[in-house]
Amino acid sequence: MGLGFEQIVADLFDRANTAGELAESYPTRGRWWGTDPDTRQAEEIDLVAGSKTTTLFMEAKWVNRPIGLDVLETLERRSTLVPTPRKRQKHYAIYAKQGFTSELVALAEKRPDLALYSFL
């Protein structure tokens, strides 16, 4: 279901973006793949969307446990590998099947650049 869930998230994003339901319009979006030059390991971000002022990095997790800080830390690290204009702000969104740990929820409440979406 992992790849199917990623497609569901992409479809939900596209619908909200087209309907003007997001804080800003994102004319470009797609999956990102690359190589970390330090580890020489392949890396992937499920969805990256760009607007005039923001790059939005999104991760979709279909797992039977709450998502924790480690997923955010990985997403933030991977976002540094994506070439983006310096003037753009970075925002992050995580979509999860089973919700989030209390630590990640508490952090998201303090960070306007982080959005969490749960399907439970």
Q: Where are the regions a protein language model picked out?
A:
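A cross-kingdom feature that marks ATP-driven nucleic-acid transaction machinery
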Residues: 1-120
